[in-house]
Amino acid sequence: MRPMWLSLDTNLQYRFDDDIAPVAFFEHLPLLLTPTDTLVLGCYDARPDIRRFLAAEAVPPAWGRFNFTETWDINREEHPFGTAFHLRADSGTLRQLIHFAESVTEHIELCDHIAAYSTEHPLLVYHGTFWEPLFVSTRIPRSNVEAFSCAIGVPFEEIDFDKTYFSAIISHDEPNA
């Protein structure tokens, strides 16, 4: 069973383990995404002005498989007002997200989860936004990921997701492990 987030559909992934400043994340996101990619913000308790902006800018999901993945719908009982907003990753949207990131005192006022995808593939997933690991698809050129890493001041590593995460789960399930 995959973790409760959008799968990147590749075993090899880039992982950023350290905290990332929200402003730096949105400022340098164009190094990873194109304006035609879709950025998804999963929000449980977004500030009202932020929620209004996200709702006004939201577009229908552009990647059919997104509807069939376990995303944030599973949390509806605990977070009945939770919503995933699909947005164009264009400069206007990112400028506004930078402005919001500068104005919040806690990241949950902005969003709880972030994902991004092209029309064909998932590109990144950030389940615990700004404090849990950010996973980036190896479909994004390594040179772009290196530039993003340099710009935000957070190192990354290439990992085999299944070996890194599922071998740990299996070993915990085995007796005397």
What are these model-derived regions, one by one?
Residues 1-177:
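Structured alpha/beta or helical-core interaction and ligand-binding surfaces enriched in interleaved
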